[in-house]
Regions:
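Structural signal for interior beta-strand "rungs" in well-ordered beta-sheet cores
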Residues: 43, 101-312
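Terminal amphipathic alpha-helical/low-complexity segments used for targeting or macromolecular assembly
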Residues: 1-105, 166, 171, 177-178, ...
Length: 340
């Protein structure tokens, strides 16, 4: 928990914003709008939360200029209060760093090259011909396979696994339990030998400024690398199959599954539990709402959904029965139209 203290004037200068109120008033933490106290700063990002502001007394509120009259206390006027909140969160709670040393329990191959300022935590394993860039932190229990390259200022949290020949760019964060570069799911059926494994000959390339959530898995490609481009963000429990390509700046929420050789364009938004079939192309700036099942190419940017919204269970059962009768109903309707 942060023990830092900042004045209204200091925070406004940090954000590059104007302020109103007591320049010397200090706060020590960020809090939700609904219950922020005099020693805390909060933010108002949307009109629908104005009622909450009326019922609370925060030390400082970050809000848009159009909302400035809604609060008479200390306030910072920001064009984007939510973005301001993101920047403040790092100011109040900077992440702790590992000591810039190799822990004595770590196993580092003699051919591995670790740049200045690399930190390696307990029980890590770093394989042959690995290269790790300046300022990167490798937390406890992480395994980095042979000939893998990790860029500058990355952070690999405990128990990350990077298989052989994976390439990670600069300023990449990978959370605990993520596995990058495991074999893609490739097998050829044989009448005599069952499923014959197809060796996955390519690898995984992760760009710069990427964040990958806990227990996410990104498989290596069969013949073409699996690619995540610069600035993409991937939540927990996501699976990218072999040969998938994720465009620059795309955001993927939890539990998404993308089948092999699909290309997702730049600046796309994928809601939770979206499923995308293989060998598809998704246009830049496409948005899929949570639970959407994608089975065809999307060539036009837009907002798409396919999941049925929640209903009361009795209505859902009736509608489910009717859904199974649609083909018969359509046949009967055509028959009636012909008879008229």
């Amino acid at each position: 928990v942060s023990t830092k203290s900042f004045s209204l004037a200091e925070l406004a200068e940090f954000l590059g914003c104007e302020y109103r109120g007591d320049a010397t008033h200090r706060v020590t933490a960020i809090a939700p709008l609904s219950d922020a106290s005099d020693s805390q700063i909060t933010f108002l990002a949307q009109d629908k939360y104005l009622a909450q502001l009326a019922g609370t007394s925060p030390g400082i509120v970050v809000l848009r200029e159009k909302h400035a009259a809604a609060y008479s206390g200390n306030r910072i006027l920001a064009a984007d209060p939510y973005l301001a909140y993101a920047r403040l969160s790092a100011l109040f709670n900077p992440r702790s760093s590992l000591p810039k040393e190799i822990h004595p329990t770590a196993i580092v191959d003699s051919s591995a090259v670790l740049a200045d300022g690399v930190a390696v935590g307990p029980n890590c394993v770093i394989g042959a011909n690995v290269r790790v860039g300046q300022g990167t932190e490798i937390h406890a229990g992480t395994v980095i396979g042979e000939a893998t390259v990790v860029g500058d200022n990355c952070r690999l949290y405990p128990r990350v696994t990077l298989y052989d020949r994976v390439t990670i760019g600069d300023k990449v964060t990978i959370h605990s339990g993520a596995v990058i570069g495991a074999d893609g799911f490739g097998f050829a059926p044989s009448k005599t030998d069952g499923w014959v494994k197809i060796e996955q000959l390519a690898s995984v390339r992760i760009g710069n400024n990427v964040e990958i959530g806990a227990n996410t898995t990104i498989d290596r490609g069969a013949l073409h690398d699996t690619v995540v481009e610069d600035g993409a963000i991937i939540d927990n429990l996501v699976h990218l199959a072999h040969g998938v390509s994720i465009g620059e700046g795309t955001a993927i929420a939890a539990c998404v599954g993308i089948a092999g050789s699909t290309t997702v364009g730049k600046n796309c938004l994928l809601g939770g539990a979206v499923g995308i079939s293989g060998h598809l192309h998704i246009a830049d700036n496409t948005q899929f709402h949570g639970g959407t099942v994608v089975t065809r190419h999307v060539s036009e940017p837009g907002s798409y959904a396919s999941a049925a919204p929640m209903q009361e269970v009795r209505a859902w059962r009736r509608n489910s029965v009717r859904y199974t009768q649609l083909d018969e109903m359509a046949y009967r309707l055509r028959k009636l139209e012909k008879e008229q």
